Curated annotation (Swiss-Prot):
Phosphorylated on serines and threonines by host kinases, including human casein kinase II. Keywords: Cap snatching, Endonuclease, Eukaryotic host gene expression shutoff by virus, Eukaryotic host transcription shutoff by virus, Host cytoplasm, Host gene expression shutoff by virus, Host nucleus, Host-virus interaction, Hydrolase, Inhibition of host RNA polymerase II by virus, Manganese, Metal-binding, Nuclease, Phosphoprotein. Influenza RNA polymerase is composed of three subunits: PB1, PB2 and PA. Interacts (via C-terminus) with PB1 (via N-terminus). This is Polymerase acidic protein. A motif (Nuclear localization signal 2 (NLS2)) lies at residues 184-247. Binds 2 manganese ions per subunit. Its cofactor is Mn(2+). The gene is PA. GO terms for molecular function: endonuclease activity; metal ion binding; RNA binding. Plays an essential role in viral RNA transcription and replication by forming the heterotrimeric polymerase complex together with PB1 and PB2 subunits. The complex transcribes viral mRNAs by using a unique mechanism called cap-snatching. It consists in the hijacking and cleavage of host capped pre-mRNAs. These short capped RNAs are then used as primers for viral mRNAs. The PB2 subunit is responsible for the binding of the 5' cap of cellular pre-mRNAs which are subsequently cleaved after 10-13 nucleotides by the PA subunit that carries the endonuclease activity. It comes from the Viruses.
Amino acid sequence: MEDFVRQCFNPMIVELAEKAMKEYGENLKIETNKFAAICTHLEVCFMYSDFHFINEQGESIIVELDDPNALLKHRFEIIEGRDRTMAWTVVNSICNTTGAEKPKFLPDLYDYKENRFIEIGVTRREVHIYYLEKANKIKSEKTHIHIFSFTGEEMATKADYTLDEESRARIKTRLFTIRQEMASRGLWDSFRQSERGEETIEERFEITGTMRRLADQSLPPNFSCLENFRAYVDGFEPNGYIEGKLSQMSKEVNARIEPFLKTTPRPIRLPDGPPCSQRSKFLLMDALKLSIEDPSHEGEGIPLYDAIKCMRTFFGWKEPYVVKPHEKGINPNYLLSWKQVLAELQDIENEEKIPRTKNMKKTSQLKWALGENMAPEKVDFDDCKDISDLKQYDSDEPELRSLSSWIQNEFNKACELTDSIWIELDEIGEDVAPIEHIASMRRNYFTAEVSHCRATEYIMKGVYINTALLNASCAAMDDFQLIPMISKCRTKEGRRKTNLYGFIIKGRSHLRNDTDVVNFVSMEFSLTDPRLEPHKWEKYCVLEIGDMLLRSAIGQVSRPMFLYVRTNGTSKIKMKWGMEMRRCLLQSLQQIESMIEAESSVKEKDMTKEFFENKSETWPIGESPKGVEEGSIGKVCRTLLAKSVFNSLYASPQLEGFSAESRKLLLIVQALRDNLEPGTFDLGGLYEAIEECLINDPWVLLNASWFNSFLTHALR
């Protein structure tokens, strides 16, 4: 094939084709069919332009080369065949002088008579398939497309063929001659089959063998092969499609497509009512830790041993009393439960050998707090199906709650840095491939940004608590086991540290199904006075249990220490997901990675290092009433992580529904910003679906508030 090309085409065309292949890193010794295709395309472009001039009156005329008037202005500017830089320079120059719209892709010619760019196509397949591929790639009505085939067929935009019939006939004759010459040398079949279709930036993978057969078998009806289906999809024009489908539907379906304009969307309505309350399974920003550094005590690593050691570091215990009662609970029972924990821990310390686990005495206060014997008796359905007034429990609608500022404060705090390191880098062996090296580099940079983050502390705390609770639920089903709430970290200097946040007492846990509930009482230390935001602590009974000496700028100050006590519950499936909270790190790393990939594809090199080390650059973090908030790349990493962690901590059906429904509105708004002229029907129904998820969940309400800020700024 290479010999044929060199014999068949003008040496100048061959040289230009060689340069083009070199520029794109292709080997003409291997890609011989591509070499022939490039030469053919170049020759057609030159023949298209040949002999066509514009005279002084601005009329298009045809002049043979030996004519003395050949100094007239050329009708066509040839862009194909130039190196990319020069080609774009020519295109920019044409756009500046003629006011033509700049094309996204390099065209082949510019027609000074019709004032338009022209894309020339030469295909070995059917012209309409290739035309659709070209049109789909270019996506511009301003660029004129003209396709020729080796069989003498042609196709052009709006059937406007630009040239006179004789000029086009010369091109078709030349293509037919090339085909005949190839066929006589036995090259045509290989050349015809090698055409891969119009490639966009995403190169088409070759599908062969079994996969190809499966692809052909998996098509919708009326399509014989994958190529035909691909051409149909590429050339599919969505405008009017939905309207057409709607007109075929039942007459009861009454959907008119309304244009979605900047003035169309309204803010999401947030519910009114009392402020929402804290519903996480453990305290977040309000938690207090009793800690030991460099633990080396006997039984170190056994939770109960660690907990007792941490309790011994505090000397300010005092007679506990209730400072913020639980509105609906029997508050003396919560107080008695804490006193029982203290007493039973003291009993353990008095024993010669501390046990590995501690089962609490089943006192009346714990039975009440853990709902022992409170569940209604289950009766077999067959025994009661004949009862005439058998009905399901009446359940009250949940009370609507309004957004409260504490949840935004919780989120801000989760994004902050602590003075401890919460995750270690695993040893995963040497990198082998370059992609592994890039992956390791990204992971290391990301870990450095989030290892001190408070959201990472919440991950490790959640993993520990859920693991311990699930283990105890399976190992001690009938016992009221005392479970210390522990986490481990390192100080900035690298010293190990064990922290105690408080205790959990679990109730009976015969968990057969994933959704069966185990009740537990949580008792957590804090320095936060609950009387400052009583609505946040609606579900808690809060005791004052001691005084803590804290170092401050004015010396040591004494602050009251509180214990936040509440009854709570969880299930096997929730504990399973809680144990896997480390996935949040992976999710946020992937989001950062997609930002790096976008940057890298623009710059055409891996931008990981620059991305993390360019400290001067700021990135969008999120929306607030003030506008788009920006911050360092580290802040972006920590914010994305905190969002992922809060999605786990505050997981609920309300969040699932809001995320799914608001995403639809988000996509419509983004389409509007991208000037895609979106249309909608039943927008009111979409708002209804979004707003029915806004009931009382603090995290969902905060997300809805953020969404409203986004709407305000996106549609300015």
